[in-house]
Amino acid sequence: MDVTRLVLATLLVFLCFFAAYSHLPPEEKLRDDRSLRSNSSVNLLDLPSVSIVALNKKSKKISRKEAEKRRSSKKEASKQKVARPRTPLSVPCVSTRGSCKPPAPACCHPCASCQCRFFRSACSCRVLNVNC
């Protein structure tokens, strides 16, 4: 009994490995550049070349004042984006995550848009860009 179970278990494991590896594409061994060029779907000559530039010591060192100026300018730029005026809200509108089937009015949130699924049977207002 134990021998037959061992044989059946071995056969089952073999069949599992055979089923798994039969679906994988065979690996190709490339021996030289010629076979690489002929087998590749993308032509390597069409890709843009990458240039490596060495940095000198002056470009690596940034003074503390310059770094603070850059940080403050980035903060000011982000504050200017936040302070942008919003469009006035229309009175009949659909709230975010509310149903907005096509005869319904527009979404209340200025950055929201009506997205439909399942052949326009389920529609809801969604905010796509949080930073809007």
From Swiss-Prot:
Query: According to the UniProt record, where is the region Disordered?
Result: 60-93
Q: Does the keyword Isomerase apply?
A: no
Any GO MF annotation of the entry: neuropeptide hormone activity
Q: Output the InterPro entries linked to this UniProt entry.
A: Agouti, Agouti_dom, Agouti_dom_sf
Which GO cellular component terms are attached? extracellular space
Q: Basic and acidic residues bias located where?
A: 64-79
Tell me where it resides.
Secreted
Keywords on record: Disulfide bond, Glycoprotein, Knottin, Secreted, Signal
| PROSITE patterns for this protein | AGOUTI_1, AGOUTI_2
Does this entry carry the keyword Metal-binding? Answer: no
Outline the extent of the Agouti domain: 93-132
Q: Which domain of life is it from?
A: Eukaryota
Which residues pair up as cystines? 93-108, 100-114, 107-125, 111-132, 116-123
Signal peptide start-end? 1-22
Glycosylation positions in this chain: 39
**Gene Ontology BP term (one):** hormone-mediated signaling pathway
- Record remark: domains: The presence of a 'disulfide through disulfide knot' structurally defines this protein as a knottin.
PANTHER family named in the record: AGOUTI RELATED (PTHR16551), AGOUTI-SIGNALING PROTEIN (PTHR16551:SF1)
The function of this protein is: Involved in the regulation of melanogenesis. The binding of ASP to MC1R precludes alpha-MSH initiated signaling and thus blocks production of cAMP, leading to a down-regulation of eumelanogenesis (brown/black pigment) and thus increasing synthesis of pheomelanin (yellow/red pigment).
Q: What is this protein called?
A: Agouti-signaling protein
The species is Cebuella pygmaea (Pygmy marmoset)
Name the encoding gene, please. Answer: ASIP
